[in-house]
Amino acid sequence: MRKTLLVLALLSFAGAAVADDEVFDKAYSMEGVSRVSVENVNGKIEAYAWDRPYLKVRAIKSAHGVRAQETLRLTEIRVRKAGDEIRLETVNPRRRRLFGFLDFGWQNAHVDYELHIPTLTQARLETCNGKVIATGFGNSIACDAVNGSIELKDVFGPVRATTVNGSVRIVFRGPLKDSRVETVNGSVDVAFDRASSIRYNLETVNGRIEGDFQLAVEGKFGPKEARGSYNGGAESLRCETVNGSIRLKAN
C-alpha cells in the first residue's frame, strides 16, 4: 500500500512539473494605424520603437502542470484592428468546472511580449503580473501594471505610468512633457533635459523627495509633498507613491 501511494505521489509530482511553451511570431502593416495597445495578464511586456513601417509581435506562451499543452492551446493572442488602432490581447480560457465546482487546479498561461513598433506610434501597454519596459518612443505612452515595475527609456512623452507593487523609472529624451506617475509600493525616478520647463506636484507618505535642483519639500516625518516650478512651469509633472521615494534629475 505504501509503495502504491509513493508511486502515485511521484507520478503526481512529475505531472505537476511538466512545462511547455509556444511562440507567436507575426508582423502587421501599420498603414492607417497611429495607435497600438496591449492587454496582458501574466507576463512582461517589452516594447521597442524602430524606424520600420510595420508592427512586429513576438509572444512566448508558457504553461506548467499536467494540462500545460491544453492551456497553451486555449490561450489566445488576439490581434484586432479598430479604426486607427491595433489591439493585442491575451485571452485566457475560462476556468473549467469539475463536478459542478470551479477547478482550482487550473493555471493560466504566462505570456511574455516583445514588440517592435514604429517610433511615432501612440502606445498603451497593460499587464497585471509582470513588468513593462519601453524604449525609444517619440509619442505619448501609457503603461499600467499591478504587480510589476515600469521602466521607460529614451521617450518623448507625454507619459502616464501607473502600478501598485513596483517602482517606476522614466528617462526622457529631451525636455519633459506632461506626465503623471503613480505607484503604491515603490519608488519613482524621473530624469529629463535641463531645458525642461516643469510645474511639479510630488507626494509620498513613507519615503523622501529629492532632486538635483532645489525642491520646496514640506514635511519632515510621515507624509511629504513638494509643489513648485522649474524653468517656468510649462509642462506638468505629478508623481505619487505611498511606500517609496521620489527623485527628479535634470540631465
Locations of regions flagged by a protein language model:
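Intrinsically disordered, low-complexity terminal regions
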Residues: 1-251
